[in-house]
Every structure is written in C-alpha cells, then in structure tokens.
Regions:
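Reductase modules of NAD(P)H-dependent flavoproteins
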Residues: 5-11, 85, 144, 148, ...
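Ferredoxin-reductase
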Residues: 2-96, 151-153, 180-181
Length: 247
C-alpha cells in the first residue's frame, strides 16, 4: 500500500521494518511515495505522530536518507541515544504512521565526472554517502569515488559489509576504512587505524588538489578535516561539509 500524500507538507508513511546495523545504531525502513523525489545525499524531517513519550527536544528529527532513490522504501539510520524520540522510534509497532517532509539539502554528488569525489565519513556520517555510492553504482556513473570511513571499532561501523561488497563489484569505487580504538574491539582488523589525516589521504590519492571533497560526521571532525584540506592547498570551493551533531 502506497504512502498517503499530504500536499506541500510531505506525506504520511508507515514504519516497515527496523534492524540494528552496528552496536548502538539502528536502521528504520519506511514506505516511500512514488512522488517522493530526492537526490542521493539529501535529508528529510521525520515526525512521530502521538509517540508513547516525548521530551523538550520534540517529535521531529532531520535524518540523511541512507537509501538510494532507486529503492522503493526510505531508510533512516541513527545512533540510539537515550532520548524520548529514539526510545519511541525503537518500540512503536511496525505499521505505525509517521510524517516525512520533502527532502532538503545540497550535499549531493557534483555533475562533472572528470573530477573525482572523495568522501570523508565519521561514524553515522556515512549515511549520505551510502545513498550516493549505491545510486552511482546503480546508474553506472563514470565518477571515480573514494570513501574514507572512520569508526572507533568494526563493531561500531554501520553498513561496513555493504560497502566492502560494493568495492569488489564497482571498479570506480574505492573504500578505505580506518578504526581509532581497536584496543577495545573483539574483532580482527587488517585495515587502516588512526584518524583520517593528510598522510592517509596521500597514501591512497595521487593528487590531493584534484578531487571534490565531501565531509560528514561529528562537528569537531568536520572542522578538523576541513582545516587539514585547506592547509594541503585544496581549494575551499572544492570542500563540501555536513555536520552530524547530537547523534
């Protein structure tokens, strides 16, 4: 059954499924209207109607859309902080109605395929990039895509397996994952460790000044990486950012 339209104000949708995609992180899948057009990398407001509990932060949150446009549902993914909104989202019955507003934002892939895209993601900041790289793969875009993905441990990394599989099947996509707290992990890790820095980028990119950079993650990380890129003589017009605060 298709989601119900609410002209100019988004539409009513239903919660279809939910699942844990990393420790302390859940993905929520909702109906998508055939008229809900969005670009990979955009976000949307999600409002719970009559939730079982509420608090001063209210019943609406803005989430990047983690699913690509070619899928017939919408996925929102979030760290499960202990708030009334997220407790409600975790426990309301499947089939619960919500309101989803029209998509917003311009954190989207550039059109000039001659310039590579370099995505720098921290934790839940992976969500817009997941949508972008999956849609690019689906559309067979010629862009060269490089994703540097930082987490504390493999246990904390949402969609790591999806991205690793995508790298194996798409020659235009390169994935570099790094873990910053492997001493606290119970899993084996053979990839990079430590924070994303200029040395790490230089080890995987032939020309730091050539690509368009996209940075998404905690505000301190975003600010630090932007400063690092500017110091490396990357044109500020080639740096695009999105903060993920409070997640």
């Amino acid at each position: 059954m298709a989601a119900s339209e609410i002209p100019m104000a988004g539409y009513r949708s239903k919660l279809l499924t939910r699942a844990e995609v990393a420790e302390g992180t859940m993905a929520f899948h909702f109906e998508k209207s055939a008229r809900f057009d969005f670009k990979p990398g955009q976000a949307a407001d999600l409002t719970l109607s009559n939730p079982p509990e509420t608090d001063a932060e209210g019943n609406t949150r803005t989430f990047s859309i983690a699913s690509p446009p070619f899928e017939n549902h919408l996925t929102f993914t979030t760290r499960m902080r202990d708030t009334a909104f997220k407790r409600s989202l975790k426990k309301v019955p499947l089939g619960t109605q919500v309101k989803i507003n029209p998509p917003t934002g311009s954190f989207t892939l550039h059109k000039n395929s001659a310039k590579a895209a370099v995505f720098l993601a921290g934790g839940i900041g992976i969500t817009p990039f997941l949508s972008i790289v999956r849609q690019a793969d689906h559309d067979r875009l010629p862009h060269k895509l490089h994703l540097f993905y930082s987490n504390r441990r493999p246990e904390d990394a949402p969609f790591l397996d999806v991205l690793q599989m995508l790298e194996k099947t798409n020659p235009n996509f390169r994935l570099v994952c790094t873990m910053t707290e492997m001493s606290k992990s119970k899993k084996e890790w053979k990839g990079e460790t430590g924070l994303i820095n200029q040395e790490m980028l230089s080890g995987h990119l032939t020309n730091l000044q050539g690509p368009i950079y996209y940075i998404a993650g905690p505000p301190a990380m975003v600010a630090g990486l932007r400063k690092m890129l500017v110091a490396a003589n990357v044109d500020e017009d080639d740096i695009r950012t999105e903060d993920f605060a409070g997640y």
